[in-house]
């Protein structure tokens, strides 16, 4: 039997099952973690009190459960802006409103070690997806509450972290200042790392700019925490900090849930513990 979708504009079934992520209303919590790799989904959800697999369709794998009593979900986005935009569009359509990217990154500033975490307060829009949503001058910035929750979580867990501006690209190689094949290394790529380093950009990854742009224009909340796998200053590469990033993101959700309850009781539009009477 062919599954019936009710619209070509927003493909979904009558019960709201989304075309790409294969999730419907009620399947995900309002707080969703966003790794790129589907294999990271069970690694992240294994840190929670409980979790179950909701769907695994294409690159989109979703688990929903609870972390320290707070409903939470995780959905993989695949690599880059296009698939990330699809995930955000469809997750928001079924009730999610707060997103934290949990990924890996390459650092370009000195003093950042393999396994450290970087919390991105903003993103340079070097990718193309966000440009199909809004003018290039539009800033890609993280939500203040989410960023503060990530910082508080990192502090409470005692992990090494940095706060900075990421550069989101569509290319892992030339787009991040790495040489291509057969000696292809044009000047715009050769100079990219130095130019961004002078501008105090901290790292490269491939999804935050799309996430931040869409979250802001749609009235959602978003933040990003990444483990440093590559150090472009020392030319080192190693997979470290993945668990710590997942724990910080999960703990940030618990903190946000507490703040959201306090915010509602106080009748405020934004919240931070410093606003307690």
Curated annotation (Swiss-Prot):
The keyword Glycosyltransferase applies. GO terms for molecular function: uridine phosphorylase activity. One of its GO terms (cellular component) is cytosol. It comes from the Archaea. Pathway: Pyrimidine metabolism; UMP biosynthesis via salvage pathway; uracil from uridine (phosphorylase route): step 1/1. Disruption phenotype: Disruption of the gene results in a complete loss of ribose 1,5-bisphosphate generation from uridine. Its EC number is 2.4.2.3. One of its GO terms (biological process) is nucleotide catabolic process. SUPFAM superfamilies: Purine and uridine phosphorylases. Belongs to the PNP/UDP phosphorylase family. Catalyzes the reversible phosphorylytic cleavage of uridine to uracil and ribose-1-phosphate. PANTHER family: URIDINE PHOSPHORYLASE. This is Uridine phosphorylase. It comes from Thermococcus kodakarensis (strain ATCC BAA-918 / JCM 12380 / KOD1) (Pyrococcus kodakaraensis (strain KOD1)). The lineage of its organism: Archaea, Methanobacteriati, Methanobacteriota, Thermococci, Thermococcales. The gene is udp.
